[in-house]
Protein backbone atom coordinates (compact mmCIF):
# COMPACT_ATOMS: atom_id res chain seq x y z
CA UNK A 1 0.00 0.00 0.00
CA UNK A 2 1.40 3.37 -0.95
CA UNK A 3 1.34 6.14 1.64
CA UNK A 4 -0.46 9.00 -0.07
CA UNK A 5 -1.59 12.20 1.58
CA UNK A 6 -5.02 13.39 0.48
CA UNK A 7 -5.44 17.06 -0.35
CA UNK A 8 -8.57 18.43 -1.97
CA UNK A 9 -6.52 20.95 -3.97
CA UNK A 10 -4.78 18.08 -5.80
CA UNK A 11 -7.92 17.47 -7.86
CA UNK A 12 -7.80 19.25 -11.20
CA UNK A 13 -10.80 20.87 -12.82
CA UNK A 14 -10.33 19.22 -16.18
CA UNK A 15 -10.25 15.54 -15.29
CA UNK A 16 -12.97 13.20 -16.62
CA UNK A 17 -14.44 12.77 -13.13
CA UNK A 18 -14.76 16.48 -12.34
CA UNK A 19 -16.71 17.81 -15.32
CA UNK A 20 -19.76 19.94 -14.55
CA UNK A 21 -23.07 18.08 -14.32
CA UNK A 22 -26.70 19.11 -14.26
CA UNK A 23 -27.53 19.08 -10.55
CA UNK A 24 -31.00 17.61 -11.22
CA UNK A 25 -29.51 14.10 -11.15
CA UNK A 26 -29.01 14.45 -7.39
CA UNK A 27 -32.75 14.12 -6.85
CA UNK A 28 -32.49 10.57 -8.22
CA UNK A 29 -29.85 9.47 -5.68
CA UNK A 30 -30.71 8.08 -2.25
CA UNK A 31 -27.91 7.80 0.31
CA UNK A 32 -28.08 5.00 2.88
CA UNK A 33 -26.30 5.29 6.24
CA UNK A 34 -26.19 2.39 8.71
CA UNK A 35 -25.66 3.46 12.33
CA UNK A 36 -24.85 1.75 15.60
CA UNK A 37 -24.15 3.66 18.83
CA UNK A 38 -22.53 6.52 16.91
CA UNK A 39 -24.26 9.24 18.97
CA UNK A 40 -23.58 12.86 17.90
CA UNK A 41 -20.74 11.74 15.61
CA UNK A 42 -23.44 10.84 13.04
CA UNK A 43 -23.44 14.50 12.04
CA UNK A 44 -19.99 14.20 10.43
CA UNK A 45 -21.27 11.61 7.97
CA UNK A 46 -24.72 13.14 7.52
CA UNK A 47 -23.53 16.72 7.06
CA UNK A 48 -21.00 15.61 4.46
CA UNK A 49 -23.61 13.93 2.24
CA UNK A 50 -26.98 15.62 2.74
CA UNK A 51 -26.44 18.30 0.07
CA UNK A 52 -24.95 15.86 -2.45
CA UNK A 53 -28.02 13.61 -2.81
CA UNK A 54 -31.79 13.86 -3.05
CA UNK A 55 -32.67 11.87 0.08
CA UNK A 56 -30.96 10.18 3.01
CA UNK A 57 -32.18 6.98 4.67
CA UNK A 58 -30.63 6.17 8.05
CA UNK A 59 -31.03 2.61 9.35
CA UNK A 60 -30.20 2.26 13.02
CA UNK A 61 -29.27 -1.16 14.38
CA UNK A 62 -30.59 -0.97 17.93
CA UNK A 63 -28.48 1.93 19.21
CA UNK A 64 -28.57 3.56 22.63
CA UNK A 65 -30.94 6.40 23.52
CA UNK A 66 -28.30 9.07 22.84
CA UNK A 67 -27.94 7.95 19.23
CA UNK A 68 -31.72 7.65 18.81
CA UNK A 69 -32.12 11.20 20.09
CA UNK A 70 -29.75 12.52 17.40
CA UNK A 71 -31.52 10.50 14.71
CA UNK A 72 -34.90 11.88 15.76
CA UNK A 73 -33.54 15.38 15.25
CA UNK A 74 -32.33 14.53 11.76
CA UNK A 75 -35.64 12.85 10.89
CA UNK A 76 -37.42 16.19 11.27
CA UNK A 77 -36.22 17.02 7.75
CA UNK A 78 -38.41 16.03 4.79
CA UNK A 79 -35.30 14.74 3.00
CA UNK A 80 -34.47 12.22 5.75
CA UNK A 81 -36.09 8.87 6.54
CA UNK A 82 -35.12 6.77 9.55
CA UNK A 83 -35.62 3.03 10.01
CA UNK A 84 -35.15 2.01 13.65
CA UNK A 85 -34.37 -1.64 14.35
CA UNK A 86 -34.83 -2.98 17.87
CA UNK A 87 -31.57 -4.95 17.70
CA UNK A 88 -28.40 -5.15 15.63
CA UNK A 89 -29.56 -6.80 12.41
CA UNK A 90 -26.15 -6.60 10.73
CA UNK A 91 -25.02 -4.32 7.95
CA UNK A 92 -26.37 -6.50 5.13
CA UNK A 93 -29.91 -6.56 6.51
CA UNK A 94 -29.80 -2.82 7.26
CA UNK A 95 -28.65 -2.01 3.73
CA UNK A 96 -31.44 -4.17 2.32
CA UNK A 97 -34.09 -2.41 4.38
CA UNK A 98 -32.98 0.96 3.03
CA UNK A 99 -32.52 -0.25 -0.55
CA UNK A 100 -36.04 -1.67 -0.61
CA UNK A 101 -37.41 1.64 0.65
CA UNK A 102 -35.43 3.66 -1.91
CA UNK A 103 -36.44 1.43 -4.81
CA UNK A 104 -40.06 1.71 -3.74
CA UNK A 105 -39.72 5.49 -3.96
CA UNK A 106 -38.27 5.26 -7.48
CA UNK A 107 -34.67 6.30 -6.85
CA UNK A 108 -32.32 5.50 -9.72
CA UNK A 109 -29.12 5.23 -7.70
CA UNK A 110 -28.30 4.04 -4.18
CA UNK A 111 -25.23 5.35 -2.33
CA UNK A 112 -24.22 3.10 0.59
CA UNK A 113 -22.29 4.56 3.54
CA UNK A 114 -20.93 3.50 6.93
CA UNK A 115 -21.61 5.86 9.80
CA UNK A 116 -17.88 6.49 10.30
CA UNK A 117 -17.31 7.68 6.72
CA UNK A 118 -17.35 11.24 5.40
CA UNK A 119 -17.89 12.25 1.79
CA UNK A 120 -15.47 14.89 0.55
CA UNK A 121 -16.97 17.88 -1.32
CA UNK A 122 -18.15 16.85 -4.78
CA UNK A 123 -17.62 13.13 -4.19
CA UNK A 124 -21.05 12.14 -5.50
CA UNK A 125 -20.65 14.41 -8.54
CA UNK A 126 -17.45 12.56 -9.41
CA UNK A 127 -19.09 9.16 -9.01
CA UNK A 128 -21.96 10.11 -11.32
CA UNK A 129 -19.57 11.67 -13.81
CA UNK A 130 -17.70 8.37 -13.84
CA UNK A 131 -20.93 6.69 -15.00
CA UNK A 132 -21.34 9.34 -17.69
CA UNK A 133 -17.75 8.99 -18.86
CA UNK A 134 -18.04 5.21 -19.11
CA UNK A 135 -21.32 5.45 -21.03
CA UNK A 136 -19.72 7.83 -23.50
CA UNK A 137 -17.11 5.15 -24.06
CA UNK A 138 -19.86 2.67 -24.93
CA UNK A 139 -19.84 0.84 -21.59
CA UNK A 140 -23.54 0.49 -20.71
CA UNK A 141 -23.42 -2.30 -18.12
CA UNK A 142 -21.86 -0.34 -15.24
CA UNK A 143 -23.37 -1.66 -12.02
CA UNK A 144 -21.28 -0.04 -9.30
CA UNK A 145 -18.86 2.88 -9.09
CA UNK A 146 -16.96 3.09 -5.81
CA UNK A 147 -15.20 5.96 -4.11
CA UNK A 148 -11.50 5.99 -3.19
CA UNK A 149 -11.41 5.42 0.60
CA UNK A 150 -8.79 7.27 2.65
CA UNK A 151 -8.13 5.83 6.12
CA UNK A 152 -7.93 8.71 8.60
CA UNK A 153 -6.27 6.46 11.19
CA UNK A 154 -3.29 5.40 9.07
CA UNK A 155 -3.31 8.35 6.63
CA UNK A 156 -3.27 5.85 3.76
CA UNK A 157 -5.54 5.29 0.79
CA UNK A 158 -7.00 1.89 1.67
CA UNK A 159 -6.89 0.59 -1.91
CA UNK A 160 -3.66 2.43 -2.75
CA UNK A 161 -5.03 4.49 -5.65
CA UNK A 162 -3.29 7.75 -6.43
CA UNK A 163 -5.73 10.60 -7.06
CA UNK A 164 -4.54 10.96 -10.64
CA UNK A 165 -4.10 7.25 -11.33
CA UNK A 166 -5.36 6.32 -14.78
CA UNK A 167 -5.42 9.98 -15.80
CA UNK A 168 -8.49 10.51 -13.62
CA UNK A 169 -10.46 7.86 -15.52
CA UNK A 170 -12.60 5.27 -13.69
CA UNK A 171 -10.69 2.03 -13.16
CA UNK A 172 -12.30 -1.41 -13.39
CA UNK A 173 -12.11 -3.54 -10.25
CA UNK A 174 -13.35 -6.89 -9.01
CA UNK A 175 -14.81 -5.32 -5.88
CA UNK A 176 -15.04 -2.01 -4.03
CA UNK A 177 -15.74 -1.08 -0.42
CA UNK A 178 -19.44 -0.80 0.41
CA UNK A 179 -19.07 2.63 1.99
CA UNK A 180 -19.00 5.12 -0.86
CA UNK A 181 -20.46 2.75 -3.47
CA UNK A 182 -22.93 4.23 -5.97
CA UNK A 183 -25.14 1.38 -7.21
CA UNK A 184 -27.63 1.44 -10.06
CA UNK A 185 -31.03 0.45 -8.71
CA UNK A 186 -31.68 -1.97 -11.57
CA UNK A 187 -28.74 -4.11 -10.43
CA UNK A 188 -30.88 -5.45 -7.57
CA UNK A 189 -33.49 -6.70 -10.08
CA UNK A 190 -30.86 -8.98 -11.59
CA UNK A 191 -28.69 -10.20 -8.69
CA UNK A 192 -30.88 -9.70 -5.62
CA UNK A 193 -29.91 -7.89 -2.44
CA UNK A 194 -27.00 -7.92 -0.01
CA UNK A 195 -26.21 -11.32 1.50
CA UNK A 196 -27.67 -11.43 5.01
CA UNK A 197 -25.96 -14.76 5.77
CA UNK A 198 -22.72 -12.81 6.22
CA UNK A 199 -24.19 -10.33 8.74
CA UNK A 200 -21.01 -8.20 8.63
CA UNK A 201 -17.61 -8.35 6.86
CA UNK A 202 -17.17 -9.31 3.20
CA UNK A 203 -20.72 -8.14 2.48
CA UNK A 204 -19.31 -5.73 -0.10
CA UNK A 205 -16.99 -8.28 -1.74
CA UNK A 206 -19.77 -10.86 -2.02
CA UNK A 207 -22.10 -8.26 -3.54
CA UNK A 208 -19.55 -7.07 -6.11
CA UNK A 209 -18.71 -10.62 -7.18
CA UNK A 210 -22.40 -11.27 -7.78
CA UNK A 211 -22.64 -7.97 -9.67
CA UNK A 212 -19.91 -9.21 -12.01
CA UNK A 213 -21.55 -12.58 -12.51
CA UNK A 214 -24.85 -10.84 -13.21
CA UNK A 215 -23.38 -9.21 -16.30
CA UNK A 216 -22.48 -5.85 -14.78
CA UNK A 217 -19.10 -4.22 -14.24
CA UNK A 218 -17.56 -2.61 -11.15
CA UNK A 219 -15.38 0.52 -11.26
CA UNK A 220 -13.64 2.86 -8.84
CA UNK A 221 -13.21 6.60 -9.35
CA UNK A 222 -9.82 7.51 -7.81
CA UNK A 223 -10.72 11.20 -7.49
CA UNK A 224 -13.97 10.57 -5.59
CA UNK A 225 -12.38 10.53 -2.13
CA UNK A 226 -14.17 9.10 0.90
CA UNK A 227 -12.72 9.79 4.35
CA UNK A 228 -13.04 6.64 6.43
CA UNK A 229 -11.98 5.32 9.82
CA UNK A 230 -11.23 1.64 9.40
CA UNK A 231 -11.57 0.13 12.84
CA UNK A 232 -9.58 1.16 15.92
CA UNK A 233 -6.02 0.93 14.69
CA UNK A 234 -2.92 1.27 16.83
CA UNK A 235 0.61 1.71 15.51
CA UNK A 236 2.93 -0.83 17.15
CA UNK A 237 6.64 -1.51 16.88
CA UNK A 238 7.95 -4.98 16.08
CA UNK A 239 11.75 -5.06 16.20
CA UNK A 240 12.85 -2.57 13.51
CA UNK A 241 9.46 -2.37 11.78
CA UNK A 242 6.13 -0.74 12.50
CA UNK A 243 2.73 -2.33 12.04
CA UNK A 244 -0.89 -1.32 12.54
CA UNK A 245 -3.07 -3.53 14.70
CA UNK A 246 -6.85 -3.20 14.49
CA UNK A 247 -8.53 -3.85 17.85
CA UNK A 248 -11.75 -5.27 16.39
CA UNK A 249 -12.83 -7.43 19.31
CA UNK A 250 -13.47 -11.16 19.57
CA UNK A 251 -16.92 -11.15 17.97
CA UNK A 252 -15.61 -9.31 14.94
CA UNK A 253 -12.93 -11.95 14.48
CA UNK A 254 -15.60 -14.64 14.58
CA UNK A 255 -17.30 -13.06 11.55
CA UNK A 256 -14.07 -12.26 9.74
CA UNK A 257 -12.75 -15.81 9.99
CA UNK A 258 -16.08 -17.45 9.21
CA UNK A 259 -16.83 -15.23 6.24
CA UNK A 260 -13.35 -15.59 4.76
CA UNK A 261 -13.97 -19.34 4.47
CA UNK A 262 -17.51 -18.70 3.22
CA UNK A 263 -16.22 -16.52 0.39
CA UNK A 264 -13.67 -19.07 -0.75
CA UNK A 265 -16.19 -21.93 -0.66
CA UNK A 266 -19.14 -20.13 -2.25
CA UNK A 267 -17.47 -18.19 -5.02
CA UNK A 268 -14.82 -20.72 -6.09
CA UNK A 269 -12.30 -17.89 -6.24
CA UNK A 270 -9.06 -18.12 -8.20
CA UNK A 271 -5.74 -18.40 -6.32
CA UNK A 272 -4.91 -14.81 -7.28
CA UNK A 273 -8.03 -13.71 -5.38
CA UNK A 274 -7.85 -16.06 -2.40
CA UNK A 275 -4.13 -15.68 -1.70
CA UNK A 276 -4.39 -12.06 -0.46
CA UNK A 277 -7.40 -13.02 1.71
CA UNK A 278 -5.57 -15.93 3.34
CA UNK A 279 -2.34 -13.94 3.65
CA UNK A 280 -4.17 -11.06 5.33
CA UNK A 281 -5.99 -13.19 7.88
CA UNK A 282 -2.81 -15.12 8.74
CA UNK A 283 -0.90 -11.88 9.30
CA UNK A 284 -3.76 -10.55 11.41
CA UNK A 285 -3.70 -13.61 13.64
CA UNK A 286 0.02 -13.17 14.20
CA UNK A 287 -0.74 -9.60 15.30
CA UNK A 288 -3.43 -10.92 17.65
CA UNK A 289 -0.84 -13.12 19.35
CA UNK A 290 1.62 -10.25 19.61
CA UNK A 291 -0.55 -7.27 20.51
CA UNK A 292 -4.02 -8.20 21.75
CA UNK A 293 -4.47 -8.33 25.52
CA UNK A 294 -7.43 -10.69 25.06
CA UNK A 295 -5.57 -12.84 22.55
CA UNK A 296 -6.82 -16.20 23.81
CA UNK A 297 -10.46 -15.14 23.84
CA UNK A 298 -10.08 -13.61 20.37
CA UNK A 299 -8.43 -16.74 19.00
CA UNK A 300 -11.18 -18.91 20.53
CA UNK A 301 -13.89 -16.91 18.77
CA UNK A 302 -11.91 -17.02 15.55
CA UNK A 303 -11.75 -20.80 15.87
CA UNK A 304 -15.52 -20.89 16.44
CA UNK A 305 -15.93 -18.91 13.22
CA UNK A 306 -13.76 -21.40 11.36
CA UNK A 307 -15.77 -24.35 12.69
CA UNK A 308 -19.11 -22.72 11.87
CA UNK A 309 -17.94 -21.94 8.34
CA UNK A 310 -17.28 -25.61 7.63
CA UNK A 311 -20.51 -26.63 9.37
CA UNK A 312 -22.48 -24.17 7.25
CA UNK A 313 -23.67 -22.02 10.14
CA UNK A 314 -24.18 -18.43 9.04
CA UNK A 315 -26.19 -15.35 9.96
CA UNK A 316 -25.81 -13.60 13.35
CA UNK A 317 -23.90 -15.19 16.20
CA UNK A 318 -26.34 -15.80 19.06
CA UNK A 319 -26.16 -13.38 22.02
CA UNK A 320 -23.29 -11.44 20.45
CA UNK A 321 -22.40 -7.93 21.55
CA UNK A 322 -21.62 -6.27 18.22
CA UNK A 323 -20.47 -2.88 19.48
CA UNK A 324 -17.12 -3.09 17.67
CA UNK A 325 -18.33 -4.48 14.38
CA UNK A 326 -17.66 -2.66 11.13
CA UNK A 327 -17.89 -3.91 7.58
CA UNK A 328 -14.62 -4.20 5.71
Regions found by a protein language model. Give the residues of each.
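A recurrent flexible, glycine/aromatic-enriched loop bordering the glycosyltransferase active site
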Residues: 166-183, 248
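A short, conserved alpha-helix in the catalytic core of glycosyltransferases
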Residues: 187, 191-192, 197-227
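A conserved acidic beta->alpha catalytic loop
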Residues: 60-69, 87, 117-118
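Short, well-formed alpha-helical segments that are part of the catalytic scaffolds
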Residues: 36-51
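Short beta-strand-to-loop acidic/aromatic patch adjacent to the donor-nucleotide binding site
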Residues: 107-116
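Non-catalytic, C-terminal membrane-associated alpha-helical segments of glycosyltransferases
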Residues: 265-328
Amino acid sequence: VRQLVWREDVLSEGSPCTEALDSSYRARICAVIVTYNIREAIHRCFDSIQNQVGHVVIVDNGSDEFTRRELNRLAASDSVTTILNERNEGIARAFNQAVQWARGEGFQWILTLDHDSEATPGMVDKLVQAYVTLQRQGIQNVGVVGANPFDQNTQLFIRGYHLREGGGMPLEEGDVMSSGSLIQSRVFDVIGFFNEDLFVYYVDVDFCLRVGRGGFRVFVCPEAVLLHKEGSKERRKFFWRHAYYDHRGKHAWYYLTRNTIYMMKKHDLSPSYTYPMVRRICKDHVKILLYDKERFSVLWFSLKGLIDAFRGRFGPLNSVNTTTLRDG
